[in-house]
């Protein structure tokens, strides 16, 4: 069988094997540390802080929040419709509709609607920077340490949590603290193989 497979492959009758995709996990805080983190986050009155809070409430990827545009938002229906072209591994014609909780709608209503992007950047940039959300997490971590707290570390990797790690935090919370089937959290995270 091995020789037959080699002959078929070498002769061009079999497609090349797919490369193995190794997932690189992003540092995430423990889900029971999130309430303390939110206390620090809610004290901040900056666009990146509101963007990070919105990301936590919607469980979106940081880049989806960074590039969220006003035409994708329907405040009356309480939805954010993300085109597949902006999502990881999605068909460009596919849509992902995110239901918005009241606080997420409140955040959106507080943002200026004068530009293309929901979360505008500083110094004339159209959208917040790629690092804005992560820098906010790092600043909150430092603020916690300065006030005698333990900060917001990923215990497995011994690294400061990052914005993308909020998705893992949600996944862990859903598994540990709810009775929902795993597929519900997977669909919330817009994972394709759900």
What is the predicted function of each stretch?
Residues 2-68, 76, 94, 126, ...:
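Basic, Lys/Arg- and aromatic-enriched nucleic-acid-binding interface segment
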Residues 39-49, 110-117, 122-125, 134-187, ...:
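Short, basic (Lys/Arg/His-rich) helix/loop patches that form interaction surfaces
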Residues 19-20, 28, 84-89, 105, ...:
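Catalytic-site neighborhood detector that most strongly recognizes the C-terminal catalytic loop/helix
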């Amino acid at each position: 069988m091995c020789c037959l497979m080699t002959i078929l492959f070498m002769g061009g009758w079999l497609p090349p094997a797919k490369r193995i995709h190794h997932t690189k996990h992003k540092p995430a805080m423990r889900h029971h540390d999130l309430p303390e983190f939110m206390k620090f986050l809610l004290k901040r009155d900056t666009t990146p802080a509101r963007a990070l809070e919105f990301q936590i409430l919607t469980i979106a990827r940081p880049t989806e929040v960074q590039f969220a545009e006003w035409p994708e938002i329907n405040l009356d229906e309480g939805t954010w419709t993300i085109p597949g072209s902006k999502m990881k591994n999605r068909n460009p014609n596919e849509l992902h509709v995110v239901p918005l909780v009241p606080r997420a709608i409140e955040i959106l209503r507080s943002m200026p609607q004068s530009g293309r992007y929901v979360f505008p950047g500083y110094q004339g940039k159209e959208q917040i920077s790629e690092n804005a959300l992560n820098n906010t997490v790092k600043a909150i971590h430092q603020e916690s340490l300065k006030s005698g707290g333990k900060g917001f570390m990923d215990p497995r990797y011994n690294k400061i949590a990052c914005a993308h790690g909020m998705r893992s935090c949600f996944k862990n919370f859903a598994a540990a603290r709810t009775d929902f089937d795993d597929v519900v959290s997977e669909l919330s995270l817009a994972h394709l193989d759900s």
